[in-house]
């Protein structure tokens, strides 16, 4: 299994990046938050997990071991695959996911596009005994975290990545751009995860 990649970022797309290692480009599917911390042409270390299906093999990438472990734990829920697991981590941090499950906060989980009441309840029932380590913050942080780019680049990337993520979740470009502009005008210090959560809250009328 490919557990990590260290190499040059040669492309950043809507939901994935390509990292070149020893002349081979690996496509890594990941969250907007991880994508926002990659810079084209620079070296990065991304922790990975491979998901093998009958029709495809995909690499999923994460900035830290906690996120990677949560991705695996989420997929132990019946009916929840890698796509929805990644959507959960696009909206909520591992700590927020674990807190929502521990506190039986179905509404917090339903902020994730694709997670309805039934799936939220299933997450709470099936994972309540599996997320204590995340809530306590004691998951082993193996591997380095990706360095953040400078503030100007980060600001531009937040706008682009959050807008693209919202479009990927089914919102129109205008809805996405308007929501991102609104939340960043209210709080310019928001990072990608924070801006995405705030934009989703605005779009859902919460």
From Swiss-Prot:
Please give the Gene Ontology molecular function terms for this protein: ATP binding; four-way junction DNA binding; four-way junction helicase activity
Q: Does the keyword Cell membrane apply?
A: no
Q: What SUPFAM superfamilies does the record tag this protein with?
A: DNA helicase RuvA subunit, C-terminal domain, Nucleic acid-binding proteins, RuvA domain 2-like
- Region (Domain II) residue ranges read 64-142
Which stretches does the entry tag as region Flexible linker? 143-153
GO terms for cellular component: cytoplasm; Holliday junction helicase complex; Holliday junction resolvase complex
Similarity comment: family membership: Belongs to the RuvA family.
Q: What does this protein do?
A: The RuvA-RuvB-RuvC complex processes Holliday junction (HJ) DNA during genetic recombination and DNA repair, while the RuvA-RuvB complex plays an important role in the rescue of blocked DNA replication forks via replication fork reversal (RFR). RuvA specifically binds to HJ cruciform DNA, conferring on it an open structure. The RuvB hexamer acts as an ATP-dependent pump, pulling dsDNA into and through the RuvAB complex. HJ branch migration allows RuvC to scan DNA until it finds its consensus sequence, where it cleaves and resolves the cruciform DNA.
Quaternary state and interactors: Homotetramer. Forms an RuvA(8)-RuvB(12)-Holliday junction (HJ) complex. HJ DNA is sandwiched between 2 RuvA tetramers; dsDNA enters through RuvA and exits via RuvB. An RuvB hexamer assembles on each DNA strand where it exits the tetramer. Each RuvB hexamer is contacted by two RuvA subunits (via domain III) on 2 adjacent RuvB subunits; this complex drives branch migration. In the full resolvosome a probable DNA-RuvA(4)-RuvB(12)-RuvC(2) complex forms which resolves the HJ.
UniProt-recorded name of the protein: Holliday junction branch migration complex subunit RuvA
Species of provenance: Corynebacterium glutamicum (strain R)
